[in-house]
Amino acid sequence: MLAGLLTWSLFEYVMHRYLFHLALPTEWGRRFVFLMHGNHHDDPDDPWRSIMPPIVSVTWSGAIWAAMAWALGGAGTVLFLGFILGYVVYDAVHFACHRLPVRGRLMRMLRRHHLRHHHGREEGNYAITAMFWDHVFGTYLSAKKAAGSAPRADA
């Protein structure tokens, strides 16, 4: 299960950095990225844009579980349980960052980290639940760094 949580956290970072902020050359491609994630940046406080629609989550989850089970057998299902737990935690944390009063030092840190991505520079702070990935990949934005430039208009 722990391996599944770690796998989720890396998946979350990679998807957010490379897929959700992908700059595609065609109008169709830009529209696809906008519908997938850009609309969340247009209105980050809209509760309907803070979590994935269930049909998308269920479809992706089924495909990921099938791949893990095929590759690892029964261990793949255990890995997937940790992965899906990570996803549920991610959705709850992400929703709370935008919509709920947060309590506790960790939640305040996660909120601050994520909101720098929205209100500072979109080129950093891609991790929502595991900020260490931004440090590992050099995309961490401190308050000073995030305030040092305007948000991108194309994401």
Show which residues each predicted segment covers.
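Loop-to-helix transition at the N-terminal end of transmembrane alpha-helices
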Residues: M1-S9
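Membrane-embedded catalytic scaffold of the fatty acid hydroxylase/desaturase
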Residues: E12, R17-A155
